[in-house]
Amino acid sequence: MRASLSILLLAGLLSGCATQGLYDWGDYEADLFDYYHQPGDKERVIENLVQHLDRMAAKGRKPAPGLLAEAGTYYLLEGDAEAAVDFYRQEAAAWPESRPMMATLITNLEAN
C-alpha cells in the first residue's frame, strides 16, 4: 500500500513538473531552417505555417508573436503582396506592440 502511494505521489509530482511553453510555435524552427537551407521546400514551409495558424485560429488561440508577420513576409517574397498585407494586418491586430512596424510595411506595400 505504501509503495503504491509513493508511486502515485511520484507520478503526480513528475506530471506537475512538465512545462508548457507560453506560445505554440508549431514546427516553426525546423521549417525556418528548411526554408533557408532547402530552397525547394519553400512552398511546403509556407503551407505548414499557414496550416498551423489556421489550427490556432480554430482553437481560438492567439498565435505566437511574429508568426503572422512571418507568413506575410513569406508571401511577399513569393510575389503576393495582397496576402502579405492581410497577414501584416492580422499581426497588428493580434499584437498591438507590432502596429507601428506593420503599419509602415502596409503603407509601403500599398503605395507600390
Go through each PLM region and give its residues.
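Bacterial Sec signal peptide processing site at the extreme N-terminus
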Residues: 11-34
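The tetratricopeptide repeat
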Residues: 66-67, 102
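Structural register within alpha-helical repeat arrays
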Residues: 70-71
